[in-house]
């Protein structure tokens, strides 16, 4: 963050389930493309830990692969998602990577994740979905 001339931000690469925060509650937590590594049971526990890390009113910004369509649409929507992949891995996910993701990772549904966020004590302030597979949430600790 030094090159961005930001002095009040500390980047802490850490596991949702293993991180032991040594200080006081924080103002902001950002996660990108990490939560889908956990099955839903552990997602809820991870989100509860993030909630506990934030001060009341603190903000959690979550960006991840989240499916925002109905189960009956899954085959067609996943096929379209994979079809829209890039060829150059430097520009994004390739078709092989997206296929592996669906096969091996734990992305969940928007209608599962949103109640999970609320259950652990977050207020969802803003939600955006792109291509039915990428979710961005801005949440506040209540």
Enumerate the language-model features and the residues they cover.
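A short His-aromatic
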Residues: 36-38
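A conserved beta-strand element that flanks and buttresses the S-adenosyl-L-methionine
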Residues: 30, 61
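Core SAM-dependent methyltransferase catalytic element
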Residues: 114-142
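Conserved SAM-binding strand-loop segment of SAM-dependent methyltransferases
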Residues: 4-18
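C-terminal alpha-helical "lid/dimerization" subdomain adjacent to the S-adenosyl-L-methionine
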Residues: 63-120, 127
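Short catalytic micro-motifs in class I SAM-dependent methyltransferases
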Residues: 33-34, 64
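A short glycine-rich, Lys/Arg-flanked "PGG" loop and its adjoining helix->strand segment in the class I
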Residues: 44-56
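A short acidic, Gly/Pro-enriched loop at the edge of an enzyme's catalytic core
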Residues: 21-29
């Amino acid at each position: 963050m030094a090159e961005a001339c930001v002095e009040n931000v500390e980047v802490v690469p850490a596991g949702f389930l293993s991180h032991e925060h040594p200080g006081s509650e924080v103002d902001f937590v950002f996660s990108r493309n990490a939560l889908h590594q956990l099955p839903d049971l552990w997602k809820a526990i991870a989100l509860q830990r993030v909630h506990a890390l934030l001060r009341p009113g603190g903000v959690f910004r979550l960006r991840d692969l989240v499916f925002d369509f109905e189960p009956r649409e899954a085959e067609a929507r996943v096929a379209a998602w994979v079809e829209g992949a890039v060829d150059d891995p430097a520009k994004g996910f390739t078709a092989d990577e997206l296929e592996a993701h669906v096969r091996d990772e734990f992305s969940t549904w928007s209608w599962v994740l949103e109640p999970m966020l609320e259950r652990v004590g977050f207020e969802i302030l803003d939600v955006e979905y792109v291509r039915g597979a990428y979710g961005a949430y801005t949440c506040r600790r209540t």
